[in-house]
A protein has these predicted regions:
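Glycine-rich, basic loop-to-helix element that forms the pyrophosphate-binding segment
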Residues: 69-87, 108
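Membrane-interface aromatic/basic loop that binds lipid-linked glycans or pyrophosphate carriers
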Residues: 1, 266-325
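The conserved acidic donor/metal-binding loop of glycosyltransferases
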Residues: 96-100, 125
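Acidic donor-binding segment of Leloir-type glycosyltransferases
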Residues: 25-69
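Conserved donor NDP-sugar-binding/catalytic core segment of glycosyltransferases
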Residues: 104-149
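Conserved nucleotide-sugar donor-binding catalytic segment
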Residues: 85, 124, 146-240, 247
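N-proximal low-complexity "stem/linker" segments adjacent to membrane-targeting elements
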Residues: 1-28
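Short aromatic/hydrophobic "clamp" motif used to bind/position activated sugar donors
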Residues: 92
């Protein structure tokens, strides 16, 4: 496709036999056709490797299969690094083996990047996808992530200069999105993914590096469905009580990276110091969480009482008017 930039779509997977075919098909369903697909195997022991190899055999001009030496399991960061080193596209975008893209993702993200030549990356919220089960009772659980509590990102449909977006990410993790599209040379310039982060915070670390120095476009559209299930890394981390420990490791890395990069921005330094203080004092953090949830619960009760009284007053007014007639 002359004139259209090539996109390297990178799917990393580990034991995703149940879902990987749907992930791959979501790339083939893209309305933007100028892409290559790199399937990065991370040491699976189920049938997902065979599925990936089948696509490579059927579509050798579009799909490539990669794996670590000795079929080793090395984690998400090492697998993404393998994908980036093998990519040929002007742009790079990632998809986990259990998630899916919506059909217009690449077309619309490439259009945004081409219309904003100074942007190094485009970010967007995602859908926390519970309804993939087909159970209608799960439909109401689907919700956007990466937009904040009011349902809107503070910088929506805006090209954000560094490091404003990073300050937001560090303060509020719910604004960390997924399914981004970035310039390949930018991903190469920031250095590789940090392989100490095998699972949790793998993407967040890369975003810290990009958002510290690069202009980033924040879109309001959702192109990425993040499948929620009991075998996901997020669920297992919470189940085994590792969330706080993993966050502290991440924040310590951010502080060390700021020191390495000689960051002088007072807002960023204030935020990271505050976040580290909270992380190192779990009792204070627990108290803060409980206070937040108690306040939020009380607010909902007050809101319900308020609307009950409003409706009661309306009914009284209606009865009064009917009585006068």
């Amino acid at each position: 496709m002359p004139g259209k930039p090539l996109v390297s779509a990178i799917i990393i997977f580990w034991n995703e036999e149940q879902f990987i075919e749907e992930a791959i098909e979501s790339v083939f369903a893209q309305t933007y056709g100028h892409w290559e697909l790199l399937l990065v195997e991370d040491g699976s022991s189920d049938g997902s490797s065979e599925i990936a190899r089948r696509y490579t055999e059927q579509y050798p001009d579009k799909v490539r299969y990669l794996e670590h030496r000795g079929h080793e399991n090395r984690g998400m960061s090492a697998s993404r690094n393998l994908g980036v080193r093998s990519a040929r596209g002007r742009y790079i975008s990632y998809l986990d083996g259990d998630d899916v893209w919506l059909p217009t993702k690449l077309e619309e993200q490439v259009a945004i990047m081409e219309s904003n030549p100074t942007a190094d990356m485009v970010l967007a919220p995602l859908l926390m996808w519970f309804s993939w089960t087909g159970n209608c009772q799960n439909r109401h659980l689907d919700q956007p992530y990466g937009v904040g509590r009011n349902g809107k990102h503070p910088y929506t449909d805006t090209l954000v200069e560094p490091p404003r977006l990073l300050a937001l990410f560090l303060r509020y993790e719910q604004y960390i999105p997924s399914g981004f599209l970035a310039k390949r040379d930018v991903m190469e310039q920031i250095g590789e993914y940090e392989e100490q982060f095998r699972d949790a915070y793998s993407d967040a670390v890369a975003l810290v590096k990009v958002c510290l120095k690069s202009p980033v476009y924040v879109s309001s559209k959702r192109w990425y469905r993040y499948r929620k299930h009991t075998a996901s890394n997020t669920y297992l981390s919470r189940l085994h009580g590792k969330e706080d420990e993993e966050q502290q490791i991440y924040l310590n890395w951010v502080a060390a990276y700021f020191n390495q990069q000689k960051v002088q921005d007072p807002e960023l330094l204030k935020i990271i110091n505050k976040m580290l203080f909270r992380c190192r004092h779990p009792r204070l953090r627990s108290l803060e969480r409980n206070l937040f949830y108690t306040t939020e619960k009380a607010f909902h009760y007050v809101k319900r009482i308020f609307w009950f009284l409003i409706n009661l007053q309306r009914q009284k007014s209606l009865h009064t008017q009917q009585g006068k007639k």
